[in-house]
Design a protein with these regions (language model features):
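Active-/binding-site microenvironments in catalytic and ligand-binding cores
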Residues: 1-150
Length: 150
């Protein structure tokens, strides 16, 4: 993985509070973007905070998180982001599958999950660094994500 894809990437953080099994929709993404007062530029990393990270130690953390609808993923793809991160441990619903991953991965977008402490982001625009471990042949890795506010 080239470092420029995960080191000091221009990033935007959006806040969309959600509870268990609630879908994240394109309308909510658009409203959160407008509320941020920022624009989402091609190549940006997009972080979506729902507040779900506070459920880290709860039995439903992995089984009932908020999830992205297929239309929300289409919205993300239309904005040509380089990385999508969220405080949910999974992007699709195990109870209402959206089946967007084949289309999503055709766009070579990195996924970052679960991100914690997005509620502490004070400004929506920043730089994201999320360096993976150098594991040969791996398709995933833990990272320590750092947010630097502009």
């Amino acid at each position: 993985l080239p470092l420029d894809r995960c080191f000091e990437v221009d990033a935007l953080a959006l806040w969309i509070p959600h509870g268990a099994d609630q879908p994240i929709t394109p309308d909510e993404l658009a409203k959160a973007l407008t509320a941020s007062g920022e624009s989402l530029r091609p190549g940006d990393a997009l972080l979506v905070g729902t507040g779900w990270d506070v459920h880290w130690d709860q039995p439903d953390f992995v089984t009932h998180p908020p999830y992205f609808t297929a239309a929300a993923i289409d919205w993300v793809l239309e904005h040509e982001v380089a990385l999508l991160g969220s405080d949910t441990p999974r992007y699709d619903s195990p109870h209402n599958p959206q089946n967007f991953f084949p289309k999503f991965f055709q766009h070579d977008i990195l996924l970052l999950a679960p991100v914690v402490n997005l509620a502490q982001v004070r400004r929506p625009r920043g730089k994201l660094t999320a360096l993976p471990l150098a594991i040969k042949g791996a398709c995933a890795s833990p990272v320590r994500a750092l947010w630097i506010e502009e």
